[in-house]
Structures are given as structure tokens and as C-alpha cells.
């Protein structure tokens, strides 16, 4: 049965991360360049938060301005740090967790992405899109 499959089979393994000291402009560039919507925030090797593209949109005009109008975003981004904007109360799953476990968490919580850990180390990220794509295959 599909729901007993481990999350490690559907997670993104090459995780793009942000350092907690990076700035929000760097975050926006990573979101757009890599066409992603969630980036784990780390301090050294420890994950301390998750920044979503939606978090950026809440404080800026990132989707509403042209590249020529970046000054607006720069001013807003300089008012906040990643740590002020990111989600801090994360729920993570182990790489050995089942897809059913992940589906239950995502369906009951307000998260759209979960960090995947192996012995406390970040080894992947799983999103609602990963889950849906797996289920429709």
C-alpha cells in the first residue's frame, strides 16, 4: 500500500537552505531562481526555521513589482531579518516516517512543507506538492 512507503522516497534530497544571517533579498533570489516555495533556515547544521515565499509576500511587493522597481523590496527587506519572518515552531519528520504520517501532519497543521531529518540532521524536505504528485502516480 502506498501510504506505508517511507517519505525518503518522495522528498527533495538536494535541499536549498538559508543561513539565519542571510538577508531577505537573498531569500527572494533563491525562491525565484530555483522555482521553490519553502526554504529551511539553518544555524550551522541545525535547522531553526522555515521561510516560505508566502512569508515574503506578506511583508513585500515581491510579486507585484517589475525588476526595475526592486528599491521598494530592498527598503522593506532591510526592515526585517529572516529570523523575524520565518516560521519557528517547526514540525519535522524522520526520513523513515511513512507518507501516511506526513499526510496526517500536513492535513491537520498549517504547514505546506516539512523538513526531513535523519539523526537530527537535515536530509530533505517534503511538500504538499510532493505528496500529491506521489499519490496521483
Located regions from the model:
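The conserved cystathionine-beta-synthase
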Residues: 18-35, 42, 83-87, 92-110, ...
